[in-house]
Design a protein with these regions (language model features):
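N-terminal intrinsically disordered/low-complexity leader segments
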Residues: 1-12, 174
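Helix-turn-helix
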Residues: 16, 24-58, 62
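Short amphipathic alpha-helical elements of helix-turn-helix/winged-helix folds
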Residues: 20-24, 41, 62, 97, ...
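Short, basic, alpha-helical segments at the C-terminal edge of helix-turn-helix-like DNA-binding modules
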Residues: 64-71
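Short secondary-structure transition hinges
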Residues: 96-136, 155-158
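Hydrophobic/aromatic-rich alpha-helical bundle segments in the mid-to-C-terminal region
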Residues: 110-113, 143-192
Length: 202
């Protein structure tokens, strides 16, 4: 991908390209996503598009990077050290805060769907690795404070927590797709947090 050519595009056209690609990658797997649909949606000529974008892989990486920046402006997870003083009270606050922000954040919603549809992409893998590293650091603070089980191996505990949180995401995604207007996010979060606490608590 030509970063220089992308940077030289008018801001409105850059935004239209990223928005069209984000919608495409969020609604389909990487294999099913169509560059032709993206080109038509953002109303670029094929010659202009391919002057900037050299592959579907580079476009997805670009989209993930932009959505991460936009999502960070809406919500950023706290530093792991913030969990040290009162692990479970902080965990409840973070869970509630994420639940409050997520339904209103277009970037978070799109990024969430892209991650689930394109786990093998390098940009998505990098994001997943950063998330798993954060989870491990958070749990280490919980272990050190005695808030969570210290008998379980730390790596197994982190894997179990990350897997359960991924299951929560998958379940919530199905709920919102099936009944987007009636999904009870508050009740769902209560059920999820209770299960997570049962898994981890000392």
């Amino acid at each position: 991908m030509s970063q220089t050519a992308f940077a030289r595009m008018p801001a409105a056209k850059r935004q239209a390209l990223v928005a069209a690609a984000a919608e495409e990658f969020a609604s389909r797997s990487f294999e099913q996503a169509s560059l032709n649909r993206i080109i038509a949606s953002c109303r670029m000529s094929k010659s202009s598009f391919y002057h900037v974008i050299d592959s579907k892989e580079s476009l997805l990486t670009l989209v993930v990077s932009h959505l991460r920046q936009d999502a960070a402006r809406d919500w950023t997870p706290p530093e792991p050290d913030e969990f040290a003083s009162d692990f479970w009270a902080t965990a409840v606050r973070v869970f509630d805060d994420a639940l409050r922000v997520w339904p209103r954040s277009r970037a978070l919603g799109l990024l969430w769907r892209i991650v689930h549809a394109n786990r093998a992409d390098p940009g998505v893998s990098e994001l997943a690795h950063a998330y798993e590293t954060w989870i491990s650091a958070v749990l280490e603070n919980g272990r050190e404070s005695g808030a969570i089980d210290q008998d379980c191996p730390a790596d197994l505990q982190a894997l179990a927590a990350s897997t359960l949180l991924a299951v929560f995401d998958e379940w919530a995604l199905r709920q919102t797709e099936a009944e987007p207007r009636t999904a009870d996010f508050g009740a769902s979060a209560d059920h999820q947090f209770r299960l997570l606490r049962r898994l981890l608590q000392a």
